[in-house]
Amino acid sequence: MKVAIVGASGAVGQEFLRILAEREFPIDELVLFGSERSAGRKYTFKGKEYEVKLLQHNDDFKDVDIAFTSAGGGTSKEFAETITKYGAVMIDNSSAFRMDADVPLVVPEVNAEDALTRPRGIIANPNCTTIMMVVVLQPIEKLSHIKRIHVSSYQSASGAGAAAMAELQQQYKELVETGEVKTISKFPHQLAYNVIPQIDVMTDTDYTKEEMKMYNETRKIMHSDARTSATCVSVSSLRSHSESVWMETEQPLTVDEVRKALAVAPGVTLEDDPQNYVYPMPLESAGKDDVYVGRVRKDLATDNGITLWLTGDQIRKGAALNAVQIAEYLIKVGNVK
């Protein structure tokens, strides 16, 4: 099988290389693509060195079976036809196609079969916060339909890319050395020792684009009429996002029912013993594949409310891993050219 990675030099592109190696993904030939800035860089995969090729409108994708793309929405839109015209499956990590009616938006633990119908040859990978939330919501949805959701996210610097992680580290360094932050470019304000209650631009709904992604994508992935109200916040940790999630179900559920469902759910690890200080934390979920969930409890304000806390590595399950799992599913059911 011939596999391509578009955006190989970025944080998600590098994670693709690690995950494909870790999971022994069936690759006969690998090709890396990037911009003019990253073309020529060399990376090692399974002991062999690969050079990043310049992404161009040519026939480089003629024999590619699966293309993982993570180079931004503009690049995805510009090159989608070039990537897919010979039959390659394009699994795209950008927001470019997520809400297009003819592009499936897939989280394998929730709606893997949607990936089988892709008129344009494109499968969209959802937003990182949405992925982690729906993996946890799905086993609860099977118990009783979820009517509405309130979520606050606590998103690490890595959600804005490798350069944002470097900026946060630089800010801490500047504070130690001079007591003043001088480097502010990837975030609208200083992030070190701070939280910023805005991720992405504002919309005319008074919600940010990031928050509206959680509303719209959750409904599409889960085939649900659930309404989601989100507040997305940047926090000064390096890696792994966290979310405080409240939901209202049609039928009352006990905490024990919810815990039992989560304990056996695919892609979920239950850590829920707060009396002994056991609960998920981003420091521990970094580099892990599962979404970790805990602090499961009945909501005190509504009869059918459940509240919980989750955390997960948004570069892995929130991006690269989810895309690789989609590809693994397609291979398993024989749905790749």
PLM ranges: what are they?
Residues A67, A157-K337:
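Charged docking surfaces used in two-component/phosphorelay signaling
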